[in-house]
């Protein structure tokens, strides 16, 4: 998982995950987050409620690349320009990561307007279920773009985009 800050800063690339432990990350909720064989793993907690793992650092404009493998029939995602309140309530934009037919790469505004961009049916097969996928998320000003396995999924301009916290 790598993030590159865009022009307002030096544009340096930062490895967000060291492959060893959760240094630089803050868990929210009861889900179990841990590192196994160099991979970041999440398991449902005892109460089966939402849980999140957030970076301790904040990023404004950035270009993020994440590799993921969705093995369970669960819902996940990458929150951008969002904030956590009241335990596990996250307000902001989420780039969806979910099984086929559930809009991976789409944009959902949590505790806001709901779906901003859902993925057309013809793009649902870009997701490789049970295999490794690469998600790229680029946020600059009021624009967010997503790519899944090299294919553009979303190009959205939204004037409500503000400060960001990756979760």
Model-predicted regions and their roles:
Residues 1-167:
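Carbohydrate-interacting regions of secretory-pathway proteins
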């Amino acid at each position: 998982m790598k993030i590159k800050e865009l022009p307002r800063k030096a544009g340096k690339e930062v490895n967000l995950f060291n492959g060893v432990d959760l240094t630089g990350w803050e868990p929210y909720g009861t889900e179990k987050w841990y590192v196994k064989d160099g991979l970041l793993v999440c398991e449902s907690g005892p109460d089966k409620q939402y849980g999140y793992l957030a970076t301790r650092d904040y990023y404004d404009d950035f270009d993020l690349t994440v590799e993921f493998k969705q093995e369970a029939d669960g819902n996940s995602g990458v929150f951008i320009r969002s904030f956590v309140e009241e335990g596990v309530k996250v307000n902001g934009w989420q780039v969806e990561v979910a099984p086929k037919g559930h809009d991976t790469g789409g944009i959902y505004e949590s505790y806001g307007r709901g779906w901003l961009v859902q993925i057309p049916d013809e793009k649902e097969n870009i997701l490789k279920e049970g295999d490794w996928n690469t998600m790229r998320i680029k946020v600059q000003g009021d624009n967010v773009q997503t790519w899944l396995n090299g294919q553009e999924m979303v190009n959205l301009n939204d004037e409500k985009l503000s400060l960001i916290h990756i979760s």
